[in-house]
Amino acid sequence: MQLNPSEISELIKSRIQGLGESAEIRNQGTVISVSDGICRIHGLSDVMQGEMLEFPGNTFGLALNLERDSVGAVILGEYEHISEGDTVKCTGRILEVPIGPELRGRVVNALGQPIDGKGPVNAKLTAPIEKIAPGVIARQSVDQPMQTGIKAIDAMVPIGRGQRELIIGDRQTGKTAVAIDAIINQKGQNVTCIYVAIGQKASSVKNIVRSLEQHGAMEYTIVVAATASESAAMQFVSAYSGCAMGEYFRDRGEDALIVYDDLSKQAVAYRQVSLLLRRPPGREAFPGDVFYLHSRLLERAARVNADYVEAFTKGEVKGKTGSLTALPIIETQAGDVSAFVPTNVISITDGQIFLETSLFNSGIRPAINAGISVSRVGGAAQTKVIKGLSGGIRTDLAQYRELAAFAQFASDLDASTRKQLDRGARVTELLKQAQYAPLSISLMAVSLFAVNKGYFDDLEVKRVLAFESGLHGFMKSSHAALLQKIEDTKKLEKDDEAVLAAAIADFKKSF
């Protein structure tokens, strides 16, 4: 068989002409080593800091260490199937999570994937988990209240929309209970809540979700859970994911409340990741940028002005300010607030609520230490009626604590000191509150008005809460219009004071 040279050249020409010109450029590398959720990769010359990397088996990672001839990355999720020699691809994107109103009522993991068995989330938008906080010009001062429904907080350490208020205390002092009550109290207030559970037991998260469902709070709440069984990388990323979900509402002129429970565990997870990446350790073996870890997160909680919202939404939303209020939680060891992470977060936030083991064990719950708990910006945001009625309470409590310590050594006390001690004991008793029972502004005003006018002074201490409960029931049944007026106007007029005083006196006769 003879081949004609012209036929060969025609065949080659046709092959060349039919050749597809599409070429795919891909930046990829090879796994050198993998252990403890940390992966070293050779190659990836164009990778970005914080870029999402794609591993085999639809697993993603985060590039954190960019070195001369290798990249250190954390794997987000299971890593048992990844082995040496596997191919890793760059995605060209920073880590993103789904955002939007579709997430309300759902429980998701740190990557925004649903873990509640209710099917896909179907969110239309995604956002990077890291975002630069609004600048000075974009912000507005905090002047709207964020009612928690807890008497001790709303009266003495008020929280405003856009504030960062730290909840700090030892384990088992009721930190989560305070935050959950604050979420339950947002029902009907047009506030979207995000609860970020970091490093908690899955059973604890399940109980919290059940409590929120029982009180009708899940319909406006998103739960982001990175439980203790998940990798350190997922625990450290979860707070930023929750924040990105909250910013969606803030930037569209709505109000949101985010609870980080807790940032101590997030710092420990970040320390674990940093040490495995061989970053140099500093104080308490934390890396040098652990302050920045929390500051860049908490600075994103802010009240933004109408111009910012209008510019962000390209004119769709006009004349509305947005806010993201943060309640970070820190767990201390034996009341040591001077440890590294607690002092960092205290210096970043706009105030703190101290919860004490001794108060909790003596039955004062919520166990708030009024003397050292402060709100640096909330005073300007406090509801007028509560502000007017709560002025004397903080002073009474501070003097009571001082006198109570002194009275232990004194055998005979004069009448005025005895009166102050008796009053302080009743105020302390009144500020006790059951869990999952946040109060409305009007009922809180009734309680504070009654204690200010001395209606509790001649009652036995153990009967104070029973009197308050009965009084609330009496006011709801006989003076509902007055309660509604206080709720609507957020004020207590002189005429209303007289009506309220008469109503309390009337109830007291029958008590």
From Swiss-Prot:
SUPFAM superfamilies: C-terminal domain of alpha and beta subunits of F1 ATP synthase, N-terminal domain of alpha and beta subunits of F1 ATP synthase, P-loop containing nucleoside triphosphate hydrolases
GO cellular component: plasma membrane; proton-transporting ATP synthase complex
Record field: catalytic activity: ATP + H2O + 4 H(+)(in) = ADP + phosphate + 5 H(+)(out)
Localization annotation: Cell inner membrane
Positions marked as site (Required for activity): 373
Known function: Produces ATP from ADP in the presence of a proton gradient across the membrane. The alpha chain is a regulatory subunit.
Full protein name: ATP synthase subunit alpha
